[in-house]
Amino acid sequence: MSKFLLQSHSANACLLTLLLTLASNLDISLANFEHSCNGYMRPHPRGLCGEDLHVIISNLCSSLGGNRRFLAKYMVKRDTENVNDKLRGILLNKKEAFSYLTKREASGSITCECCFNQCRIFELAQYCRLPDHFFSRISRTGRSNSGHAQLEDNFS
């Protein structure tokens, strides 16, 4: 009987070791999908920035049947003529002026995900306003499907 308990204890220890190893690897693989940025980063060599990012998002969203979340109708051109008159009396040397500036954190933004890092197609699609049925749990083929898999199906 004690031999059986010893084997059972050994098997449980091996199983626990295996589960802990798998759990630690899962944590590492999930962390690869999280992007973080700071103000000192340079754009990724294969990142999408500026006008290129805008064009890709526009084309992707329209091909998926959705709209961009950041709509141009909410953008307003600012009137800067009167600003110059108010600031005319304030003069700073370059060093003093730059001392008031700090680098912006771009964490969690489309710029962080796609310009400073290399983003994937499903990360780009998160910035589209997609139809409700797009991320349904059951696809047209009847199999269980996540939004990522359905997105890949749409481009296949």
Curated annotation (Swiss-Prot):
InterPro entries: Insulin-like, Insulin-like_sf. The keyword Signal applies. Residues 1-31 form the signal peptide. Its main location: secreted. It holds the Pfam family Insulin. One of its GO terms (cellular component) is extracellular region. Keywords: Cleavage on pair of basic residues, Disulfide bond, Gamma-carboxyglutamic acid, Neuropeptide, Secreted, Signal. The modification 4-carboxyglutamate is found at E152. Disulfide bonds join C37-C114, C49-C119, C61-C128, C112-C115. GO terms for molecular function: hormone activity. It is found in: Secreted. Residues 79-93, 96-102, 141-156, 144-156 form a propeptide. Expressed in the central region of the cerebral ganglia mostly within the F and C clusters. SMART domains: IlGF. One of its GO terms (biological process) is neuropeptide signaling pathway. Heterodimer of a B chain or a B chain' and an A chain probably linked by three disulfide bonds. Belongs to the insulin family. Involved in glucose metabolism. This is Insulin. It comes from Aplysia californica (California sea hare).
